[in-house]
């Protein structure tokens, strides 16, 4: 269960208390591709305040503590951080610079270049395939800085509802054949059909297909849509209301089929139920 748009530091505990075991936050860049703040901006989901924010490096410092065992702020349930990279707001020519900057800030403020025990997995949410240079830069930077081992903690996810074969082609260009999630969804203000979601799930379940390990639906607020997604077999849902998802998961139909992921579950492995 991914808490959606958790952009203020005080919202982290709020969403965890509602039952989320993952959080998504938005990263806003300046025109040069430097990550500045966690901030969504207007418009955003219905019924939500769009303007909450924090300085990105301060947010990382806090979330490091929240995901470090034995830290006073530690919350065991938080196992995944989804960075919603607002690259569509900057020139595609700056995507590489943005990838370098985010990698260095994670190295300095989250992983602390090997001196941090923060353990959450990281999901890089890229809005459009045209911004794939962000991924190349991110991986290049980890390599150049001597921390390629952190690649094991990082997954890729394209969130713009683009053609799945087009996404596969870009992953092929990048040489990525594992640690890939696929999102499908729309703002909670609108309804969305299931055609592309079903296609993504079919690809995930195709033997030998290496470009989708997990599929999640976003942003779900109605229990009926949560149930629909679970019946289709999604691996996760993003919601403004994690507590509603918890209630649905306790229903007789789902209680034996689904459970919340823990740190002992590998987010890059396909679930074979």
From Swiss-Prot:
Protein's job: Dermonecrotic toxins cleave the phosphodiester linkage between the phosphate and headgroup of certain phospholipids (sphingolipid and lysolipid substrates), forming an alcohol (often choline) and a cyclic phosphate. This toxin acts on sphingomyelin (SM). It may also act on ceramide phosphoethanolamine (CPE), lysophosphatidylcholine (LPC) and lysophosphatidylethanolamine (LPE), but not on lysophosphatidylserine (LPS), and lysophosphatidylglycerol (LPG). It acts by transphosphatidylation, releasing exclusively cyclic phosphate products as second products.
GO biological process: killing of cells of another organism; lipid catabolic process
Record has Isomerase as a keyword: no
Family per record: Belongs to the arthropod phospholipase D family. Class II subfamily.
Active site: 4, 40
Protein name, UniProt field: Dermonecrotic toxin SdSicTox-betaIIB1aiii
Co-factor(s): Mg(2+)
Tissues and organs where the protein is expressed, per its UniProt entry: Expressed by the venom gland.
Cystine bridges: 44-50, 46-189
GO MF, one example: phosphoric diester hydrolase activity
Keywords from the UniProt entry: Cytolysis, Dermonecrotic toxin, Disulfide bond, Hemolysis, Lipid degradation, Lipid metabolism, Lyase, Magnesium, Metal-binding, Secreted, Toxin
GO cellular component terms attached to this protein's record: extracellular region
Catalytic reactions of this protein: an N-(acyl)-sphingosylphosphocholine = an N-(acyl)-sphingosyl-1,3-cyclic phosphate + choline; an N-(acyl)-sphingosylphosphoethanolamine = an N-(acyl)-sphingosyl-1,3-cyclic phosphate + ethanolamine; a 1-acyl-sn-glycero-3-phosphocholine = a 1-acyl-sn-glycero-2,3-cyclic phosphate + choline; a 1-acyl-sn-glycero-3-phosphoethanolamine = a 1-acyl-sn-glycero-2,3-cyclic phosphate + ethanolamine
EC number: 4.6.1.-
Cofactor binding remark: Binds 1 Mg(2+) ion per subunit.
Main localization, broad class: secreted
Residues the entry annotates as binding Mg(2+): 24, 26, 84
InterPro entries per record: PLC-like_Pdiesterase_TIM-brl
């Amino acid at each position: 269960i991914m808490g959606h748009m958790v952009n203020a530091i005080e919202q982290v505990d709020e969403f965890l208390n509602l039952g989320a075991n993952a959080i998504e936050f938005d990263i806003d860049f300046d025109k040069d591709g430097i990550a500045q703040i966690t901030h969504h901006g207007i418009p955003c989901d219905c019924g939500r305040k769009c303007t909450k924010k924090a300085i990105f490096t301060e947010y990382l410092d806090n979330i490091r503590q929240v995901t470090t065992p034995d830290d006073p702020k530690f919350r065991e349930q938080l196992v995944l951080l989804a960075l919603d990279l607002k690259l569509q707001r900057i020139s595609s020519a700056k995507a590489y610079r943005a990838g370098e900057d985010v990698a260095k800030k994670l190295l300095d403020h989250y992983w602390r270049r090997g001196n941090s025990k923060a353990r959450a997995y990281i999901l890089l949410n890229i809005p459009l395939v045209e911004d794939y240079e962000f991924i190349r830069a991110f991986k290049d930077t980890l390599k150049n800085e001597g921390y390629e081992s952190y690649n094991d903690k990082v997954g890729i996810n394209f969130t713009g509802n683009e053609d799945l074969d087009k996404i596969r082609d870009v992953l092929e260009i990048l040489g990525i054949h594992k640690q890939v999630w696929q999102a499908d969804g729309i703002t909670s203000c609108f309804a969305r059909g299931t055609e592309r979601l079903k296609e993504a799930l079919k690809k995930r379940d195709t033997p030998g297909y290496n470009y989708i390990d997990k599929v999640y639906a976003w942003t779900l607020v109605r229990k009926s849509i949560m149930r629909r997604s679970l019946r289709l077999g999604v691996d996760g849902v993003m919601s403004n209301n994690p507590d509603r998802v918890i209630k649905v998961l306790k229903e007789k139909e789902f209680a034996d089929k689904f459970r919340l992921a823990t740190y002992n579950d590998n987010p890059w492995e396909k679930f074979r139920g």
